[in-house]
Structures are given as structure tokens and as C-alpha cells.
Amino acid sequence: MLSAKTIEIVKSTVPLLQEKGVEITTRFYQILFSEHPELLNIFNHTNQKKGRQQQALANAVYAAATYIDNLEAIIPVVKQIGHKHRSLGIKAEHYPIVGTCLLRAIKEVAGAPDEVLNAWGEAYGVIADAFISIEAEMYEEAAHKEGGWKDFRNFVIVKKVKESDVITSFYLKPEDGGKVSSFIPGQYVTIQINIEGETYTHNRQYSLSDAPGKEYYRISVKKEKGVDTPDGKVSNYLHGHVKEGDVLPVSAPAGDFVLNMDSTLPVVLISGGVGITPMMSMLNTLIEQDSKRNVYFVHAAINSNTHAMKEHVKAVENEYEQVKAYTCYSAPTEKDLEMKNFDKEGFIESEWLKTIIPTTEAEFYFCGPVAFMKHINAALTDLSVKQEHIHYEFFGPATSLQ
């Protein structure tokens, strides 16, 4: 339990964190990786280079300071981060290392006096304990459910399927021949990739793109532009070098962006680009479980060449009367225009959504590039969709949709 004095001191640093938060977290990661380079086997190098991880951590530290007198308020965020930590294999012993480096960064960047550093040291201990406790429960649950396991387990790529010019699916089965644990539609797994010539292991999280209850997991990966770009290194390796029969270490499914199976409301699945992957898991689950809920599947792509899984979605729409699918192409090809195989040219807008979705009393799920997600969030706000009915997932560190 933190003293009133400690809480007061930590809360007094909120303006400082607002002003220098990213500077502090940038310095923190420099210290962390300089003194503990082995942790580069866990953290996503791309998010480091782009500054996304630094921003996400700055946001988390700022929230912790703001709500230090009411940490219950940030438990949902702690759980969301906890899912990623469990998926990556972050353990209790990592927290003291992080705490030491964070306090050093606060001192170096802000010139914080000992009184502030001591207060933050106490506060960090309480926050770390919350993470450790929640993540311990997650490790237990993942390991002890049927077909479950702890940390990483080797999976064989039994099938590799090209879904579009830029997206390929990988079907994964356990190398040990055992069962795979079930998951909730919308969840992801972490895969480990060791690229020849690279010093450190690359971890990447990919949404599971099929319904649970199969003998395999399926991930569907977008090939990012440029082999030498941070984004493209792993995705190009998967597309170009990983083949059927290869083995990849995989973590148990994780994540809190999940389909609410208890709701009876209609379901609206809105995706942009590779954001279609968790939506496919949700769609397939709804039809396989014979749900009678109306489903509106809205997808945005550049054109038919980059539009993955369109034949499957069309087949589902044709077979199940409760499913309606709509496609928006930002730059349709001449063939697309000739075939009229899409519903709207340009971008998804609130006025168009109003014409294809008859009610705002529905569960709305969306995923895609950050700019797309900001646009969709604004559109749903325009339509006065209730906040509790809006669900979304970032591919990478969380950011603001405002």
C-alpha cells in the first residue's frame, strides 16, 4: 500500500511525464538494451526503430502516474499489456531490471531528485506486482487448458497458401503431434523467427485467421514492402524462405480483442487490408457455431489483387442468409471496374455505413492500419454507436484513435 506522500509525489510528476515521457522511455530502452542485450530476443525491433514502443510505454507510465491513487482504473490496460507479455515470454525476473533502467532514465532526462525517484521506485514496485500477478494467472491458464502449453512450442508448417498478391496463409500443427488449445476468435499467437545472419531472434504476433476447434492454427501474413525495411524483414522472410515442413516456435493464443459470444446483437466486422485476419476467425466461428446473429462483413482493400479471402467470404454470404458482405476498393483495377466486383470506390464513410448497416445497436469490431482505424472510429462516433459496443485491435503497440 502506497503512502499518501508517495502518491502525492508521483501525481506531481504527471506534467513532467506529459512533456518528457517519450524522451524518458527512449532513454530507458537505450539503457535497457545496452546493459541487457539479451532482451532484444524478446522486444520487437521494428517497433523500437519506429518509436511506437517508446510512445506506448510513455502512455502507460503517464496513465500509471495519473491513476496511482486508483490503479483499478487501469487494470483493463494492464491485462491487455499482460496478454502481450505472456505471449512474448516476459517473466517476473524481468521487472526489477526494467524498474532499475526506468528510474535511471527518469533521473537522467528529468534530473529528478531522490525524493521523486524513491517515490517512483515504490510505485513501480506496486505496479510491477500487479503485472506479475495477472501474468502468472495467464501463464497458468495457457499451460493447463486442454492442448495448452507454457512459453513456446514447435509447430510444423503443414500448408502454405497464397491468399492475394500480398497475403499468404500458414497452417501450423504441433510437431509433437498433440492437440492445440482452443482460443477465442480475435486472439493472436507469437511466432519466433531466426533469420540467418541476424544476431537476435525476431518475435512477431499474428492474429489467428480461422475458427477455433481445428487440428491446426492458421495465421495470414502480409508481405510488407522492402526486404531491407524494418517492417519487411520478417514478413518477406516468411513469404520467401519459410516453406511447408519448416518448424516455428509458437506461443499459446493470447489477446483481449475477442468476439463476444454471449451477446445476441448483430455483429459488424470492419477491416482494412491485413486487418481482415481476426475478422475471418470471427466470421468462421459465427457460421460454424450456427449463430443466427446478423453479420455485416465490411472490408477495404486497394483492389482485388490485394484483397485476401474474397472467394471464401463470398461463398459464406451465398450460403448463409444472415451474412452480408461489402467491399470497398480505394484504387480498383480496370478489371474490377469492368467486373463490378466491389460495392464502393474510395473509402469507408459513415454515410455509406448508414446505408448498408440498418442498426447501430450492434457489436462493432474493426482492425487495420492505424490511419484506417482512426477513420473508422470517427465514422462510428458520427453514427452515435455506443462506446461499449466498439471493439478494436492494434497490430503493434497501442496508440490513440483520437
UniProtKB/Swiss-Prot annotation:
SUPFAM superfamilies: Ferredoxin reductase-like, C-terminal NADP-linked domain, Globin-like, Riboflavin synthase domain-like. It catalyses: 2 nitric oxide + NADPH + 2 O2 = 2 nitrate + NADP(+) + H(+); 2 nitric oxide + NADH + 2 O2 = 2 nitrate + NAD(+) + H(+). The record marks Y29 as: Involved in heme-bound ligand stabilization and O-O bond activation. Keywords: Detoxification, FAD, Flavoprotein, Heme, Iron, Metal-binding, NAD, NADP, Oxidoreductase, Oxygen transport, Transport. Its EC number is 1.14.12.17. The record marks K84, E393 as: Influences the redox potential of the prosthetic heme and FAD groups. GO terms for cellular component: cytoplasm. The active site is at Y95 (charge relay system), E135 (charge relay system). Residues 147-402 are annotated as: Reductase. This is Flavohemoprotein. The lineage of its organism: Bacteria, Bacillati, Bacillota, Bacilli, Bacillales.
